[in-house]
């Protein structure tokens, strides 16, 4: 059994700490945020993640998991210290290491013996050595320690499963002793272990996320071409993805990636490349495609409706993906303001992310936790998040709620055949449009194309 302190009780810290406790370690999760620790002690989990609340409760009852604001005491009582604080994107696009530096300084000031200090946060190449120098200076060389990079690869919405069934453990360190300690810690996960130096471990996380983001932007560019040549991107993706060299994952066309990782990490990697004097044109294009994809779905809506001024639009999905309340870089946070700039009123649905989204979007949006209520008496519907409740909508019922049977689907949830049979005007991503049983100009008198371009050109992304 290892004694572990996890500094930072955000998404990564809380999930990692809880899973380390689950495999039999003594874990204390600590944070400077007193209200967050108070909530955790009272059994209130600050993030939504399937299975996390039950696992926290179980390990608290088994006395393997505790929470505290007393970070110095947690440091002194532990053998392994994980840094799992936020690394938000700075104004220049680089990762902001303010919290990492502060954690390293605190660790150095309270060392009382040999410790293994582990960076779990996603950090730029060179951060491990920076942490090492900060701890060394703050501790005044009184005690020995080692620094390890051990990046996380969990996905929001399936983080517990991803941690307990991890596909690999990456351990970066110049110390064989420290690497062996962290490798032993990961043995119960039965995952392949990759041992390397600090720099390579730090780069692995960025490279992995950038590659996945590249697959998403690639299939979205293919989807946009498919729309112009009459191809169906879902069939194209199937045909491409069955090639074992490529794989089917992350080849689902849509409105682009969001969340706390891909947008931040692709931008940070671009800055790392620039700092190293390398023009990373591929990642520049990945980011550009992702940003344009959000405008593309609004363009589709304008193509059907001519104008949304004075119209009410229902938006289904505020979280960046299902099974999370995370709205960081969520498509909805860009698309809803675009609709408002174009003069539309928005009724938005999300089962769990309304508190987080409303704090950003404000009170000009009507919010609903009932998917049907969000669509009642609206002129068109935009699907932005593939929540199960959206996938399972009764299309016959939806048609009675909408003023016009118009659905713009950013997640390709429905087959073209069922939408045609149900009589919808249905536009999705990278697939032929369904015109419905009535021409769209029955509902929307068309505007000249130059007017559509003028409307869309006025939108600020």
UniProtKB/Swiss-Prot annotation:
Q: Which residues form the active site?
A: 261
Q: Which residues bind substrate?
A: 152-156, 205, 209, 250-254, 258, 321
SUPFAM superfamilies per record: 6-phosphogluconate dehydrogenase C-terminal domain-like, NAD(P)-binding Rossmann-fold domains, UDP-glucose/GDP-mannose dehydrogenase C-terminal domain
- According to its UniProt record, in which pathway does this protein act? Nucleotide-sugar biosynthesis; UDP-alpha-D-glucuronate biosynthesis; UDP-alpha-D-glucuronate from UDP-alpha-D-glucose: step 1/1
- One Pfam match, given by its short name, reads UDPG_MGDP_dh
Q: Which UniProt keywords apply?
A: Cell wall biogenesis/degradation, Cytoplasm, NAD, Oxidoreductase, Phosphoprotein, Stress response
Gene Ontology molecular function terms on file? NAD binding; UDP-glucose 6-dehydrogenase activity
Binding-site list for NAD(+) = 3-20, 31, 36, 122, 156, 264, 328
Q: Does the keyword Cell wall biogenesis/degradation apply?
A: yes
Q: What induces it?
A: By phosphate starvation, via the PhoP/PhoR two-component regulatory system.
Q: Give GO terms for biological process.
A: cell wall organization; polysaccharide biosynthetic process; UDP-glucuronate biosynthetic process
- What does the record give as EC number? 1.1.1.22
Reaction it catalyzes: UDP-alpha-D-glucose + 2 NAD(+) + H2O = UDP-alpha-D-glucuronate + 2 NADH + 3 H(+)
Q: What is the activity-regulation note? A: Activated by phosphorylation; inhibited by dephosphorylation.
What is the superkingdom listed in this entry's lineage?
Bacteria
Q: Which family does it belong to?
A: Belongs to the UDP-glucose/GDP-mannose dehydrogenase family.
Q: What else is known?
A: The nature of the anionic polymer present in the cell wall of B.subtilis depends on phosphate availability. Under phosphate-replete growth conditions teichoic acids are present, whereas under phosphate-depleted conditions, at least part of the wall teichoic acid is replaced with teichuronic acid, a non-phosphate containing anionic polymer. The synthesis of teichuronic acid is accompanied by degradation of teichoic acid and reutilization of liberated phosphate for other cellular processes such as nucleic acid synthesis.
Protein name as catalogued: UDP-glucose 6-dehydrogenase TuaD
